[in-house]
């Protein structure tokens, strides 16, 4: 099992939790499910706010929203067959080139989270997708993250085209899982209002 996204300095308990998530285990003390269906969105990833994610303000620290979105990205890559197994078999991977995270509502210790992921587009070298994090019980949206990933040839560690069969599969996935309209928050930029 690869823990390539887990920082070396993380304590053993946090590394174990990440390993359980990556392995898709459901007996790790919190739910972790990957649903694949032909209905939109492409995946739904679930998690629970853990004690080590709570900051001095009594809510989940902003960094852990990104961690949950990263776990959802791993689930997305597995669902699209561009995850760890793809990297090992092809020598290719995906690197995140750009993200934009918008925090909308607090979440607290023990809150169940659901992340829905939408495919916004793909070309020969890029994948554009959008995560929405919801409070599972209330249904309120808590945060969103928009991402652009680049396809990388790991042998030279440079951007490279997807192999033709993978590119075709991604195009089919985008057709199947693209939202009818852009989700609220997609395409935003950070700027001060004009005066």
Q: Residue locations for each model-derived region?
A:
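Compositionally biased low-complexity segments, especially N-terminal hydrophobic helices
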Residues: 6, 17-22
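Terminal targeting signals and extreme-terminal segments of soluble enzymes
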Residues: 13, 21-114, 120-195
């Amino acid at each position: 099992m690869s823990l390539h996204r887990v920082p070396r300095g993380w304590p053993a308990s946090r590394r174990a939790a990440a390993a359980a998530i990556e392995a898709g285990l459901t007996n790790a003390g919190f739910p972790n499910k990957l649903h694949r269906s032909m209905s939109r969105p492409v995946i739904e990833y679930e998690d629970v706010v853990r004690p080590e994610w709570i900051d001095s303000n009594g809510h989940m620290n902003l960094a852990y929203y990104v961690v949950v979105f990263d776990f959802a990205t791993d689930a997305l890559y597995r669902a699209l067959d561009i995850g760890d197994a793809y990297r090992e078999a092809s020598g290719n991977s995906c690197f995140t080139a750009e993200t934009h995270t918008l925090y909308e509502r607090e979440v607290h210790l023990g809150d169940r989270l659901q992340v829905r992921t939408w495919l916004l587009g793909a070309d020969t070298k890029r994948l554009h997708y959008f995560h929405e994090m919801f409070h599972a019980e209330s249904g309120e949206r808590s945060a969103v993250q928009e991402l652009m990933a680049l396809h990388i040839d790991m042998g030279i560690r440079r951007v490279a085209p997807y192999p033709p069969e993978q590119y075709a599969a991604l195009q089919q996935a985008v057709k199947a899982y693209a939202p009818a309209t852009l989700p609220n928050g997609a395409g935003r930029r950070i700027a001060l209002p004009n005066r």
